[in-house]
Amino acid sequence: MAGGAVIENLSNRKLFVIFAGLLVIQIMFFLIGAWYAPSPSSYMEFEMITCRDETKGLSGEWIHRDNCQQISELSEYTPSSFDLREIVFIAKMPHTRDGIELEYSPWFQFLLGVLHVDVEYSEHFKYVAHAPLELEVRMGYRDKESKKNEWKELVTSNVTRILECTIAEDEKKAGGTYDCDMLDLFELGSSSYPFYLINIRIPINQQACQFDNKSANCQIGKLTGLRLIEIHQNGGFTLVWLWTKTFMTPVVAICLWWYYNRINQLARNPLLLERAILLLGLSLVILDFPIEWISLTYRIPFLLLISDLRQGLFYTVLFSFWLIFAGEHLIDDNTRNNLKSYRFNLSFIITASLGLLIYDLIERGIQLYDPFYSVWSSPTGSQIAYFAIFISAISTVAYFIFLFFKIARVWSTIKSKRSAQIYQTSENRRLKVEGVIYRFKFLMLFTLLCSAFTIAAYFMKQYGEAQLHGDEARDGFLTGSTSAFFTGAFGMCNIYVLLLLAMYAPSHKHYRGASQLIDENDDDEIMEDPSNQHTESNAMTTFLKPSTD
């Protein structure tokens, strides 16, 4: 049996069967998302009811539809004092439809709320660009066993958002309206309760505004109403997603254990490339593990944070592996199989990962106890977020420049050595080396395809989440029919890692304890080891290493 990895010793027929089977599985992942999974997210829109509270919130009483002294037209309402805290905007989530009280389900996984502010043009109450909007927000919840209006407090918070509005020239008249951007309001990392109630007060002291127009909410213009758009993950998508992860987790775990046993039974220490593949498989098992099943029974408010951390770990390991995968076929024997040789390139990945980790820990971490917090709501928080994202973006761009440079060098090295050496050898050896090169090229092309699809899926997910927080929340990428894209990307990542585990496992079926494997049926080795150090290595790596002649 020949030495090296499995990919170098399988027959073309077996490889074709394996690749054809993987292609069928990949198509199945796409079809599962296209046929069985609904769109990833859905939304509900609430026209917040305007109520009058004479106590101005001092009583601690929840204001809901049944005890609401409704204000029919806010623009015509005359308050009883200068303090406008007596005006309360309420929304009970979810809707009551056709007399049936709808419920939120743990299958929804998360709840996200964005706020739309209706501002009317007025010569007396003028809107000032970039006006800070201060809100006193109170969120309550109710269980199925509780009485209809028995609300328990979830969180109370004072939040500040920047109100960005524009108006056309022909709208600058009585009754004209501003076009205002959506505002982030809250984000819950789990859908733990079936019913929620929101009370919002906008603290405005009209007397203070007369003396200082920079007082709280004195520059927001003539506010006529609030609309709340709530977004959640579809339960049907969650079901398909969880069963897909549940099916793939043991498959990847078994393959990872098989791969570990293969490299552990060798008489040498694992190569750097083998250790990188092992770590990549482990990170995929962590990513695939369907911890979301637990959230269906128990309240896990930190589920979004865990999801982000798992995804960040996988992408960090995956990007590091791509560098090592390309680099191990280029560097010379003095530095090959040494992680220190990649410390410069890996520093870009570490920097980008740390930047995004800091941003995520601040945003998601604080939201664990204050879902109304947004890192973008304060100048200091915005600066930290922008700095972290900027450093991460620069590092990511630099990383991909190095990666594509290394891949280009690999292809160039293959071409030059192929023309210089292969055809000077025997026909049998030439055919073997041609097979090794062909299979390596295929895997490299599949790596490029997987990297492109993985990066596209990552950025499309980030773009979709940004849309959920902005003006395109109702028509965003994640609220469209994109389930096939995400299940397809998930399938490709798993297939790619499984292919690496299977194809790059040491091929030593009959020579488990040997330090060097030799083909008994061929005296002419595919790649001779001139140093005669008796270290089983990848044949492609041996072929591409610099000549010592």
Curated annotation (Swiss-Prot):
<dbReference type="GO" id="GO:0005789">
    <property type="term" value="C:endoplasmic reticulum membrane"/>
</dbReference>
<dbReference type="GO" id="GO:0016323">
    <property type="term" value="C:basolateral plasma membrane"/>
</dbReference>
<keyword id="KW-0217">Developmental protein</keyword>
<feature type="topological domain" description="Cytoplasmic">
    <location>
        <begin position="405"/>
        <end position="439"/>
    </location>
</feature>
<dbReference type="GO" id="GO:0005794">
    <property type="term" value="C:Golgi apparatus"/>
</dbReference>
<dbReference type="GO" id="GO:0061355">
    <property type="term" value="P:Wnt protein secretion"/>
</dbReference>
<dbReference type="Pfam" id="PF06664">
    <property type="entry name" value="WLS-like_TM"/>
</dbReference>
<feature type="signal peptide">
    <location>
        <begin position="1"/>
        <end position="34"/>
    </location>
</feature>
<feature type="transmembrane region" description="Helical; Name=5">
    <location>
        <begin position="384"/>
        <end position="404"/>
    </location>
</feature>
<dbReference type="Pfam" id="PF21883">
    <property type="entry name" value="WLS_GOLD"/>
</dbReference>
<dbReference type="GO" id="GO:0031090">
    <property type="term" value="C:organelle membrane"/>
</dbReference>
<feature type="transmembrane region" description="Helical; Name=2">
    <location>
        <begin position="276"/>
        <end position="296"/>
    </location>
</feature>
<dbReference type="GO" id="GO:0030177">
    <property type="term" value="P:positive regulation of Wnt signaling pathway"/>
</dbReference>
<keyword id="KW-0879">Wnt signaling pathway</keyword>
<dbReference type="GO" id="GO:0060069">
    <property type="term" value="P:Wnt signaling pathway, regulating spindle positioning"/>
</dbReference>
<feature type="compositionally biased region" description="Polar residues">
    <location>
        <begin position="530"/>
        <end position="549"/>
    </location>
</feature>
<dbReference type="GO" id="GO:0031901">
    <property type="term" value="C:early endosome membrane"/>
</dbReference>
<keyword id="KW-0732">Signal</keyword>
<dbReference type="GO" id="GO:0040025">
    <property type="term" value="P:vulval development"/>
</dbReference>
<feature type="topological domain" description="Lumenal">
    <location>
        <begin position="297"/>
        <end position="310"/>
    </location>
</feature>
<keyword id="KW-0472">Membrane</keyword>
<dbReference type="GO" id="GO:0000139">
    <property type="term" value="C:Golgi membrane"/>
</dbReference>
<feature type="topological domain" description="Cytoplasmic">
    <location>
        <begin position="258"/>
        <end position="275"/>
    </location>
</feature>
<dbReference type="GO" id="GO:0061357">
    <property type="term" value="P:positive regulation of Wnt protein secretion"/>
</dbReference>
<dbReference type="GO" id="GO:0048557">
    <property type="term" value="P:embryonic digestive tract morphogenesis"/>
</dbReference>
<keyword id="KW-0967">Endosome</keyword>
<feature type="topological domain" description="Lumenal">
    <location>
        <begin position="36"/>
        <end position="236"/>
    </location>
</feature>
<dbReference type="GO" id="GO:0005886">
    <property type="term" value="C:plasma membrane"/>
</dbReference>
<dbReference type="InterPro" id="IPR047843">
    <property type="entry name" value="WLS-like_TM"/>
</dbReference>
<keyword id="KW-0812">Transmembrane</keyword>
<dbReference type="GO" id="GO:0031410">
    <property type="term" value="C:cytoplasmic vesicle"/>
</dbReference>
<dbReference type="GO" id="GO:0012505">
    <property type="term" value="C:endomembrane system"/>
</dbReference>
<dbReference type="GO" id="GO:0000132">
    <property type="term" value="P:establishment of mitotic spindle orientation"/>
</dbReference>
<feature type="topological domain" description="Cytoplasmic">
    <location>
        <begin position="505"/>
        <end position="549"/>
    </location>
</feature>
<feature type="transmembrane region" description="Helical; Name=1">
    <location>
        <begin position="237"/>
        <end position="257"/>
    </location>
</feature>
<protein>
    <recommendedName>
        <fullName>Protein wntless homolog</fullName>
    </recommendedName>
</protein>
<comment type="similarity">
    <text>Belongs to the wntless family.</text>
</comment>
<feature type="transmembrane region" description="Helical; Name=4">
    <location>
        <begin position="346"/>
        <end position="366"/>
    </location>
</feature>
<dbReference type="GO" id="GO:0030334">
    <property type="term" value="P:regulation of cell migration"/>
</dbReference>
<keyword id="KW-1133">Transmembrane helix</keyword>
<dbReference type="GO" id="GO:0006886">
    <property type="term" value="P:intracellular protein transport"/>
</dbReference>
<dbReference type="InterPro" id="IPR053936">
    <property type="entry name" value="WLS_GOLD"/>
</dbReference>
